[in-house]
A protein has these predicted regions:
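Alpha-helical transmembrane segments of multipass membrane proteins
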Residues: 100, 104, 184-189, 281, ...
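Functionally critical transmembrane alpha-helices in membrane proteins and complexes, commonly lining
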Residues: 15-73, 91-101, 122-136, 279-284, ...
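C-terminal "closing" transmembrane helix and its immediate cytosolic amphipathic cap
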Residues: 1-11, 166, 296-304, 318-371
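Transmembrane alpha-helical segments and their boundary/interface "anchor" motifs
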Residues: 53-56, 72-108, 118-127, 153-156, ...
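Juxtamembrane loop-transmembrane helix junctions in multi-pass integral membrane proteins
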Residues: 12-18, 41-50, 85, 89, ...
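Aromatic-enriched alpha-helical transmembrane segments of multi-pass intramembrane proteins
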Residues: 122-147, 153, 157-277, 318, ...
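Membrane-interface junctions at the ends of membrane-embedded or membrane-associated helices
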Residues: 72-79, 165-173, 233-247, 289-305, ...
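Conserved beta-strand->loop/alpha-helix structural units within folded catalytic cores of enzymes
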Residues: 23, 28-31, 63, 94-98, ...
Length: 371
């Protein structure tokens, strides 16, 4: 009789990190306010809103962290299967992405008038395929914030490979890796500032040259942030969830972020957009991934609920806002006097409904047919 073969125990599922989900709500709202508000309305928080574009870099870094937090152990044990992972991520990403394109169909009329016929045809094909971000001129075609989903899709594609890369086992080596990835993230912004490829000596958020768009919207410049997040998950695994260290890290990250954003107008814009804040994002994430006063605040149930709809809010907000205001809905209903606050409420309501009625049912259906 052959000896029994003992299979390796399945990797335990990681615990949830509700405070980070709550933080996603604030980051998504900050992008909404950045696009559609006057930062001065927010008093002491004005510097955060005025530099709301940095929330996108935060999302990309946290994407690497969350994926590694959930999948690194499975990759090490051999349980991570790339096709299964891709289906899981696609079921989360694409239904809402496609719904947002349907909501944004009216934007194609405007795109037709400002693009060449070749550009328009390329945009119509590339955007549903999550490829538009690879073309600087087409990255914001059809749905402006959707370029980040092209970047995310690329990161999802490579994640099963890069998560298996050998990384240091000790905190010191991991810290060196984080530092090197941060420096790598600064290479392209520094080159842009040095070479002035668009002919702009002092680029800012309104600079719209080809090379600035390549720096802001194409996937490669954001890869160091994603990899930084993966390594950060290894650092996180070595720190106790309880204790004052996490609290101090979180406080240091939040204070550092506020300080840098307060002086945001004096910081090099390409670096701010593409990775300068990685270390401070990391401190904030490590702090909120613990059990302390800050994580309890961001883990407040309503914040977490909105954080779960943050992707829907992000991908829908730009064109849904324009649709609300171009339709005359607020004037016809007499709600215009409550604008913009009523518009923010409508965006949040639309995001939550999209999550409940489209994202989650579609996710369950796609996963069921793949089993």
């Amino acid at each position: 009789m052959p000896p029994a073969v003992l299979s390796a125990p399945a990797v335990a599922k990681k615990g949830r990190l509700p405070a980070l989900t709550g933080l996603r709500a604030f980051a998504a709202l900050n992008i909404v306010f950045f696009h559609f508000s006057n930062p001065k309305w927010f008093g002491p928080f004005a510097p955060i809103v005025d530099n709301g574009y940095t929330s996108v870099s935060f999302f990309l870094l946290m994407s690497g962290y969350i994926l590694a937090y959930n999948y690194s152990d499975r990759a090490k044990s051999g349980e991570l299967r790339a096709p299964t992972f891709w289906v899981a991520r696609l079921s989360r990403l694409y239904p809402v992405y496609f719904f947002a394109l349907i909501v944004s169909l009216g934007m194609l009329v405007q795109e037709w008038h400002v693009r060449t016929h070749m550009q328009f045809a390329a945009g119509v094909v590339m955007t549903p395929l999550l490829l538009q971000g690879w073309s600087p001129s087409l990255a914001t075609f059809w749905n402006t914030p959707a370029w980040t989903m092209c970047t995310e899709a690329f990161f999802y594609l490579i994640f099963p490979m890069v998560v298996r890369w050998r990384r240091p086992k000790h905190l010191g080596g991991l810290t060196v890796n984080l530092f090197l990835l941060w420096l790598l993230g600064m290479v392209l912004p520094v080159l842009y500032l040095w070479l002035h490829p668009d002919g702009v000596l002092h680029p800012d958020r309104y600079t719209d040259g080809f090379w600035m768009r390549a720096l802001k919207f194409t996937p490669p410049p954001h890869l160091p942030s994603f990899l930084f997040g993966i390594v950060l998950a290894d650092v996180d695994a070595k720190l106790a969830r309880d204790g004052y260290k996490r609290l101090l890290l979180g406080l240091g990250g939040v204070a550092g972020l506020y300080t840098i954003l307060y002086f945001g107008d004096h910081m090099p814009y390409p670096m701010m957009h593409d990775g300068l804040l990685m270390p401070l994002f990391a401190l904030a994430i490590l702090g909120l991934a613990g059990r302390n006063l800050i994580s309890r605040f961001f883990g407040f149930a309503p914040f977490v609920a909105l954080g779960q709809a943050s992707y829907c809010l992000y991908i829908l907000h730009f064109n849904l806002w324009n649709l609300i205001h171009s339709s005359g809905l607020l004037e016809k209903t007499g709600l215009i006097q409550l604008d913009p606050w009523i518009s923010y409420l409508l965006l949040i309501t639309g995001a939550v409904l999209t999550m409940v009625l489209i994202e989650r049912p579609a996710q369950r259906w796609i996963r069921s047919i793949n089993q």
